[in-house]
Amino acid sequence: EEKKKPGPLAGFSDKAMADFRKLGLPAMRHEEWKYARVSNLFRNDLRIGTEETGITQADMDKFRLPDADSATELVFINGIFNPALSVVRHLPEELIAISLEEAANGDYAEFVQANLGHSADYHPDGIHALNAAFANNGLFIAAKKGKLIEKPVYIYNLSDSRPGFIFAQPRTLVHVEAAAQLQIAEQYITIGGNES
């Protein structure tokens, strides 16, 4: 069952679900997917990712990347941005890291509206649409104009598969303003023995 999202992201999710209904899952006859049997992924019972997990800071510490103590660390749990486990170590005049919902409702609303899901315009397929439809409140990163951000931004994507197969759809929108530089490293981690 589809979960209705309030606010500006609701229309984005609704359009993506309509696109998925029209496009369906890609099959081997689609060039980009000819070596993948995507339908096999959906034979298991799926759990849509939620924040309600037992993942703690102690769990996170096991997966931290090198020099994490000086980097900005942004955490997704089951596809949902988790500010409580995230640490922004850059100054606000250099880097903004907020929820996608906050960006869509604030100073970056126009940018979010113009760019969120833009890749579907030139790469329409069912998996892309499904990802967008179930992308819960994601992450927005903005590197401010002219700023050279020397320390990296680490994004940790944790899937807690202990309760079962997790269908998590992390979504990050990055805005690098003119003459700014930014380094981002992402890590994908599954906790538990089930697939995610």
Model-derived features with residue positions:
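Glycine-rich and polybasic anion-binding loops at the starts of cofactor/ligand-binding domains
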Residues: 1-196
